[in-house]
């Protein structure tokens, strides 16, 4: 398994629309970051590749929806290099989404507070507004991800097999 952590903030269109409110975003080199990600993913020999960023690419919730900047700039890279899971937060919900034309499992991890109300969309495998956390376990030929609510109760699990 190999983990790749990226800063998604400068890839979000909304932050570029208000430069005075988000001045640091304008200074970040997104071309360099995405080039690094492409290079590292292309060299990876890992059975399981997980990319982790703060903002979800795809999300179904009352206050948020899919992020166009990430769909344009990040998602094609994840698909090309057959990333198994993209894990994000920001939305304060549990979500597991898949796209018919993508090998990527898109996961939104919940939070310890301020749960929000997700909306089950056509690509949603699971969603919940409960607070909680996720656990990833990796074996020789299987990766399991479990969503656990704030009471410590597993509420959803999925597997990816080689």
Protein language model regions, located:
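Metal-dependent phosphoester/phosphodiester hydrolase catalytic core
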Residues: 1-120, 125-127, 135-162
């Amino acid at each position: 398994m190999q983990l790749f952590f990226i800063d998604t903030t400068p890839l979000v269109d909304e932050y570029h629309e208000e430069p005075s409110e988000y001045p640091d975003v304008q200074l970040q080199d997104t071309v360099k970051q995405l080039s690094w990600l492409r290079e590292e993913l292309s060299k990876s020999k890992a059975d399981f590749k997980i990319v982790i960023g703060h903002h979800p690419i795809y999300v179904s919730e009352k206050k948020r929806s899919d992020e166009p900047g990430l769909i344009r700039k990040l998602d094609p890279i994840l698909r090309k290099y057959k990333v198994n899971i993209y894990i994000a937060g920001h939305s304060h919900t549990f979500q597991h989404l898949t796209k018919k034309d993508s090998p990527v499992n898109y996961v939104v991890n919940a939070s310890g507070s301020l749960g929000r109300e997700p909306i089950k969309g056509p690509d949603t495998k699971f969603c919940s507004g409960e607070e909680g956390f996720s656990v990833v376990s990796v074996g020789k030929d299987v990766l399991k991800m479990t969503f656990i609510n704030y009471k410590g109760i597993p509420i959803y699990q999925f597997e990816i097999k080689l």
